[in-house]
Design a protein with these regions (language model features):
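Non-Sec secretion/translocation targeting segments of pathogen effectors
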Residues: 1-58
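Basic/polar, acidic-poor N-terminal "presequence/leader" segments
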Residues: 49-93
Length: 326
């Protein structure tokens, strides 16, 4: 399914898989929930929210109040063309640019400034990432799940990365075929990216900034009661989905999200060889991250395939995984 009309995405098409990351660091004893016979249910579905607990409602701001904000604004504009400057000006006038409804209360402006002035991950371009982030916030309907082709000059590198540690000749041959993705299974991930850009632009900009930085990851603090009705059930879910996290109490947890290890190569290719209607480097990183969350850290951006304990298919996410991701 496409994301061009993502608010009406048809999820009747089955989505699909999983793997693991590092063990989690938790102050909460999870032994009581290891052997639950029934998978715990999620808290009732609510609109995406980035707020840490007890964050007050935010006023809309349309004026640059401080010298720091004015400097950030001027710096961002200096890296954009005429059309880009017009879009940013409109984001300011509509209150989007100074929106601070993000997990760390940073504004869209703050994160765009970091993208423009701080180093990006290897092979990523700050101006491209800045332009793509602004465009997605201004008009989320441009977000797509359309994979790009692998240019000849990248083919050998991509196949080698996908066949890393494989010794069986059949597996190696199959691995060389799997990198030519024709039909994407990232519908849920693209839909989640869309909703984040549309509903929480400051959090979207924060994700874009952190995921494209050299650390290639983003932290997010959540209230455990937003994940499940019972704290131990929330911990069970985080462990079941292999989400790296830390807890200091029974109320909140700091989660770490990251794209899969091959996403950076896909993003590098899209930075230099993006064709019209294909995903941007930002789309690659965002969608890989959300696929990792839903597939228990088993997604591979080179093949658009996954493994996982909750589904035996190797594409997309099933409903349970979709609900957890969102």
């Amino acid at each position: 399914c496409g994301v061009i009309m993502v608010e009406q995405v048809n999820f009747r098409t089955r989505q699909y898989n999983y793997n693991t990351i590092n063990s989690v660091k938790s102050a909460v004893n999870t032994s009581d929930v290891k052997n639950l016979s029934v998978t715990p249910t999620f808290t009732a579905s609510v609109p995406i929210t980035s707020k840490a607990p007890q964050v007050a409602s935010l006023k809309m701001r349309t004026t640059l109040d401080s010298k720091e904000e004015k400097n950030e604004y001027t710096t961002i504009l200096s890296q954009l063309d005429k059309n880009g400057r017009k879009i940013v000006d409109n984001l300011l006038k509509t209150g989007v640019l100074l929106n601070s409804d993000s997990n760390d209360h940073s504004t869209v402006l703050d994160n765009l400034y970091k993208i423009a002035t701080e180093p990006r991950a290897e092979g990523l371009d700050s101006k491209t990432m800045l332009k793509d982030t602004i465009a997605a916030i201004a008009y989320p309907y441009i977000i797509t799940q359309q994979f790009g082709d692998i240019p000849p000059e990248y083919q050998q590198q991509v196949v080698a990365a996908n066949n890393e540690n494989k010794t069986n000749l059949i597996d190696i041959w199959q691995g060389s075929q799997d990198v030519n993705v024709e039909h994407s299974g990232t519908c849920v991930a693209a839909s989640t990216e869309f909703k984040l850009a549309k509903q929480l632009p400051a959090e979207f900009a924060r994700f874009a900034q952190e995921l494209s930085s050299p650390k290639l990851s983003v932290n997010k603090t959540i209230g455990l009661n937003n994940l499940a009705d019972e704290t131990l059930n929330a911990i069970w879910l985080l462990n079941a989905f292999e989400i790296p996290f830390e807890t200091n109490n029974f109320n909140t947890a700091k989660l770490k999200f990251a794209p899969d290890k091959n996403a950076i190569l896909r993003a590098q290719i899209q930075t230099t060889n993006k064709d019209p209607y294909e995903r941007t480097p930002l789309d690659v990183l965002m969608q890989s991250t959300f696929m990792q969350i839903g597939s228990q850290q088993s997604y591979n951006s080179l093949t658009d395939k996954r493994a996982g304990k909750f589904n035996q298919n190797d594409k997309g996410l099933i409903e349970f995984e979709k609900t957890f991701t969102e």
